[in-house]
Amino acid sequence: MTLPAATVIVVSRHRAAELARCLMALAQQDHPQIEVIVVADPAGIEAAKATGLPLKLLHFDEANISAARNLGLSAAAGEMVAFIDDDAVAEPTWLSRLCGALARPDVVAATGFVRGRNGISFQWKACEVDALGLDHPLPDDATTYPGAPARAVKTQGTNCAFRRPALLSIGGFDPAFRFYLDYADVNLRLAGHGLTAVVPDAQVHHGFAASVRRRADRVPTDLHEIAASIAVFLRRHAPEALEAETIPAIEAQRRRLADLRRARRISEPEAERLAASLAAGWDDGMARPLSPLAALVPTAPGFMALPETGPRRGAVISGRIWQRAALMKQARIARAEGRVVTVICLAPSPRAHRVAFTDHGIWLQTGGLFGWSTREGPRLRLAPFTRRIAEETARIAPLRPVL
């Protein structure tokens, strides 16, 4: 199957190092015809330039991710347009899997699964979102779903793709959503245009880097924009819910604060400050002007292909923890040859496994020979080294090349 040309849009602000790593992973995609647009602040633009990759670079330094995405969308030239966060890295097969699902003419959107900070456990799978902004889990199968104005498949913001003409026609992203629920709003507005595909094997790793709104451990530092977006979402999609005594999505945030306080992850003054930001954000969202969304006008000067993407050979390099320096040296040589490289470096221990994408563009899996990787089944895995390497190689083979 010939894959349609695709544009990947990455919005970045105050995360230059993470952006560079994200772009390095995109350069290893097996999709043969992609362009990458970076919409970023000055530091992000400089980090993108330093990669040496031919990228469309758009300067944007405002705290409004929807407006930034619209800027990138207008400049996109691919038939399909995909989005990934700057603190995420994509498996080499990610984009081709999403675009493969979009090759069906009745599919207008596609979303995949997201692995969390340990690089193995899933952070997000498939779910629907309703008009109240609440999520509802879906089966893990690869399938397509029709949508409705009050309920649609939720495309995860760090792992999704759309038919560009369809997304342009609905006005792209609503700038009233400066952060949070921006994709849920798109999903409900796009629901009548076609099916949404759930593609479990289209995977990214999402690190949840620190930002102005959260710490590196995912504890929030400000809830203003979350509350504002909840208010805007209800005004757009369920205005009758504003008359209710309680707002479920706001109550969920209050429970979140209570849970964090009980776990002693935030202090009482921090909890009070976060609660105040939640209330102020709600008032802001209720007062925020809402304008009709007109179709976006494309401004793309032409398709700027990222060179040397497409299918390539892989390599799995394995060894013991005391061999790590030699393994990484071997991996850098294989990477310089153009391969997608995975290093599996194990210690004689029961430590759980982790996977990371290094600054050298190498997939590094570490942990104990007897530790679990998938967080399923027994924690202690009694297996000889060669069998364990074979098992882990088989686990990753559907996602990235191993030979």
Question: What does each model-identified segment do?
Answer:
Residues 154-171, 176-202:
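A short, conserved alpha-helix in the catalytic core of glycosyltransferases
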Residues 24-33, 335-336:
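Short, acidic, metal-binding catalytic loop of nucleotide-sugar glycosyltransferases
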Residues 130-152:
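Short, flexible, basic/aromatic active-site loop/helix in glycosyltransferases
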Residues 1-25, 311-317, 388-403:
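N-proximal low-complexity "stem/linker" segments adjacent to membrane-targeting elements
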